[in-house]
Design a protein with these regions (language model features):
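Short aromatic-glycine-(Arg/Gly/Cys) micro-motifs in beta-strand/loop hairpins
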Residues: 1-28
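Intrinsically disordered, low-complexity regions enriched in Ser/Pro/Gly/Gln/His and often acidic
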Residues: 4, 8, 35-36, 57-59, ...
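Short acidic, gly/pro-rich beta-turn/loop elements at beta-sheet edges
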Residues: 22, 42, 107-109
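A short, exposed loop/beta-hairpin motif centered on an aromatic-Gly-Thr core
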Residues: 25-42
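Ordered hydrophobic segments in well-structured contexts
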Residues: 9-15, 30-33, 85-87, 96-98
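Short, mixed-charge low-complexity intrinsically disordered segments
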Residues: 49-128
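Generic "edge-of-domain/loop-turn" microfeature
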Residues: 19-21, 39, 104
Length: 128
């Protein structure tokens, strides 16, 4: 089943990287496709609230500052289709969440798709 037209939304990601490292590349941690500004904003807020108890005091303060003050800026920016970034540093690691406005293109529905009949001809090989 195909959707009939492109849909506006937000692509959300979470990355981590060592602070000050010139050799290590950022590590991708998670992504989320949000179909509203509120949904995108909520994804970051839930992640921050979830990890806040495990953060050091400076990182926890930064997280709560965004949740109380910075989140309002994010809520105003997203409907204007402006990208937003939230970053905190904890124990030598920078954790960054990004929210970018995107246009989701129509694709085949992810559920209910059947594999071609020939897919049953291939057997899993045990390497043990």
């Amino acid at each position: 089943m195909l959707t009939d037209k492109p849909r506006r939304g937000y692509w959300c990601e979470c990355w981590t990287e060592p602070v000050g490292s010139r050799t290590e590349v950022p590590a991708f941690r998670a992504s989320f496709d949000a179909y509203s500004a509120a949904q995108a904003d909520r994804w970051v807020a839930v992640a921050l609230r979830t990890i806040t108890p495990a953060l050091d005091s400076d990182a926890s303060d930064a997280a709560w500052t965004w949740l109380h003050d910075g989140r309002a800026d994010t809520r105003r920016a997203l409907p204007r289709r402006e990208p937003c970034t939230v970053a905190i540093q904890h124990a030598g690691t920078c954790i960054t969440w990004t929210i970018r406005p995107v246009l989701f293109l129509p694709v085949a529905h992810r559920q209910g798709a059947e594999l071609p009949a020939c897919s049953q001809d291939f057997k899993h090989l045990n390497t043990d």
